[in-house]
Amino acid sequence: MAKNVNSKANGKKSGSVKRALKEKKQPEPEFSDSEDDEVDQEKLVEELDEDFDEVANMLGADVTDPEEKKQSKLERKRKRDEEATAEYTKPEVVDNEDDAQNDKFEDAGLSEPTMRAISDMGFKTMTKVQAKTIPPLLAGKDVLGAAKTGSGKTLAFLIPAIELLYSLKFKPRNGTGVIVVSPTRELALQIFGVARELMAHHTQTFGIVIGGANRRQEAEKLAKGVNLLIATPGRLLDHLQNTQGFVFKNLKALVIDEADRILEIGFEEEMKQIIKILPKEERQSMLFSATQTTKVEDLARISLRPGPLYINVVPETAASTADGLEQGYVVCDSDKRFLLLFSFLKKYSKKKIIVFLSSCNSVKYFGELLNYIDLPVLDLHGKQKQQKRTNTFFEFCNAKQGTLVCTDVAARGLDIPAVDWIIQFDPPDDPRDYIHRVGRTARGSNGKGKSLMFLTPSELGFLRYLKAANVPLNEYEFPTNKIVNIQSQLSKLIKSNYWLHQSAKDGYRSYLQAYASHHLKTVYQIDKLDLVKVAKSFGFDVPPKVNITIGASGKSIEKKHKKQKRA
């Protein structure tokens, strides 16, 4: 049953803040039926059908971003990529507005168990990406797919994968027939949940292996036979290299989801090793990516067979974001940002809202602050233990209303139901990040949602980049008399509460550090920031002394502090 988001930090405030801060030889494939096999399979299905909470309890640390490669190396690689990709024919599937709107699952020739599951899930009509992708995948073609976020591509690759296992009558002793690789643990869990629903009436087995989970338990289940396996790259490579009894020589399909994100977070070498280890003969491959970068092309070249079908249901002239999304921005000085956010969250307290910030420490501080002043929120960021991240994610998914304050850990691939508003309190690094953030709302073919981006006057140049990326925005204005001015109360609170003061200082420092690390240096110039005003948004009357090590030296920040104090 749907519930509202409630924070435990609403009780005794100061106390709550203190507590909060204080290879065995592999068997030959045998695709045969027997009654004993059916009994064993049913037993294994029960063992492998793990509950989300069980999986969550085994999760661990976060994945960090790697350093970028040197520009000269990238340029050489880009030229090599362009020459190599010329040998690939990629006939684009042209999308028509009148097409792919009335395609029904019942007309796709799917098996009875799959159709029962789809009916149980409440689906009747395919989305565009499903209508364009499922038929060629069922026909055995390799596919390189591009689609808007929230377009329904999880079903687009899971349905053909499950149909393949069903048609081959896979048994546990045949090992793993399909592997789905996902960039993050949360997304892997989400795909696992969809797979569990789709396979409710099938006898094939399924499972998940992700970083931070109990590796020994995973290995035991792999040895028993997991026909459909969802995995994160690092843990999958570990099992491929080290787990005896993991039968993968009968692999028939490989799915790489969110390929661009997998590469962005540093799994390029792992993916190359995985593809090198996995059998290539008779293997169908599917690669999905929201953006087509040179690295994605490189990965497609080594993972897909020559001549894959390229499916892009988003014409280049179309808007990059969902049709049902209303997008806007507001120009606001740094010292008024938090006051405007507070007023907005108060006004829309009955809505379901996601607020994006640029750093973990900022999320931690504003989460603590908002809960302390009786505006309950949930918070999600990469420094949290995986179990808390997973529990928070599912709590917000199940909530009918409430606010989630988070970093970009929630901005990619995750399907959070019925989000009304996306607030980009801290600006995104580039248009791609903007698109993935707003993609958490207006999901599905008829989804509706709204987004609001906060910009300071010096950041308005970012709008040019969004326009070039076909992102339509309107300027919103908020009357000054509608903004609740709690600046003096905020300042007194930060002065009097040691724990909030420390948290605010950490958040302020991390905000500057993240700002200095932006790629669009012509838009986000730390030297143009009014540090006094920025500090006010964190509750300080005077900017605290901080040392940032990315993009600017601590010395330059100190000088600017002194100059602005004299002013």
From Swiss-Prot:
User: What biological-process GO terms show up in the record?
Assistant: maturation of LSU-rRNA from tricistronic rRNA transcript (SSU-rRNA, 5.8S rRNA, LSU-rRNA); maturation of SSU-rRNA from tricistronic rRNA transcript (SSU-rRNA, 5.8S rRNA, LSU-rRNA); snoRNA release from pre-rRNA
Any one GO MF term held by the record is:
RNA helicase activity
Q: What is the catalytic activity of this protein?
A: ATP + H2O = ADP + phosphate + H(+)
Does the keyword section mention rRNA processing?
Answer: yes
Where, in this chain's numbering, is ATP bound? A147, K148, T149, G150, S151, G152, K153, T154
Location(s), subcellular: Nucleus, Nucleolus
Give the record's family classification.
Belongs to the DEAD box helicase family. DDX18/HAS1 subfamily.
Q: What is this protein called?
A: ATP-dependent RNA helicase HAS1
Upper classification of the source organism reads: Eukaryota, Fungi, Dikarya, Ascomycota, Saccharomycotina
Q: Which gene is annotated as encoding this protein in its UniProt record?
A: HAS1
